[in-house]
């Protein structure tokens, strides 16, 4: 009798959990109606998996019909994220990135949320030195980081740091390549976005770093509205990266992309999890909230999550090329990270 009561209780708990997950999933699909709904969308993958796990044992109970419907819904909800996550590359028809063109230079952008109180800044500086990116977009640039980044000023002399009012969530943009002549790097008034026009050997590209606040009930929705002007001011060819605190399929990220006339890059995978949890769990069950956007002549070729550097976010390395009519002029001082495939003999 007691065993039957326990079984009934477990079935009831599983059914209620399945129902709660379904309500949250449905709410997340209506993120454009209100930011409160969009807050559920960031957990769509987790909710879909949890609902499926709750539904499976219910298939052997009187709730089998409801469980079957829930399983189908979980699969459908999960499928809505497949075009945004890296596992979509398992299917050739959904290949996420374009193949490299041997006639174009390949550049590297490193996106990092540094974490304002990172106890291991040397790991960050070491990673930058080893990977040698052309441009770097940084989030959570606190006063501590403003000092630490000074150690690589000779390697990255072109830079702009934009402080946030709380002194913690600022952004920064560092470049090995010069900012375009006659242009000026600029900060959004509250330090949530930094923009500079970078000269890639004669081709000018707007590069931006962005850091959004947390979703509703925090200020993310209103903050995106405040960023309308700098986003819409991005040039015809641009690349932007940052911690959006939002999943790539969310209404928030789609809104950012629409304001800037940008395309969201398929995610490299989960990049964030609570700082106390292990790295292997972050790579498997974290949230994919570090995004890269592009438009115009920028072609994205790859995106890779790098090793842990003491932050609650993983760094993301992006390889891209410029798809313009005029290829950049030959330059004997071409940066080491721009790999140009040459045929014939080298200049003498």
Predicted regions and their residues:
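Glycine/proline-rich, flexible active-site/cofactor-binding loop segments
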Residues: 51, 57-85, 182, 188-206
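N-terminal signal-anchor transmembrane helix
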Residues: 60-61, 68-130
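Soluble catalytic domains of enzymes that build or remodel membrane lipids, polysaccharides, and related
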Residues: 109, 115-130, 135-348
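Short, flexible segments with low predicted structural confidence
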Residues: 11-12, 19, 100, 146, ...
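Small-residue packing motifs within transmembrane alpha-helices
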Residues: 10-18, 66, 70-73
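Membrane-embedded alpha-helical segments of integral membrane proteins
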Residues: 11-59
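Short, Lys/Arg-rich, polar N-terminal cytosolic tail immediately upstream
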Residues: 1-7
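Hydrophobic alpha-helical segments, especially transmembrane helices
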Residues: 45-47, 65, 212
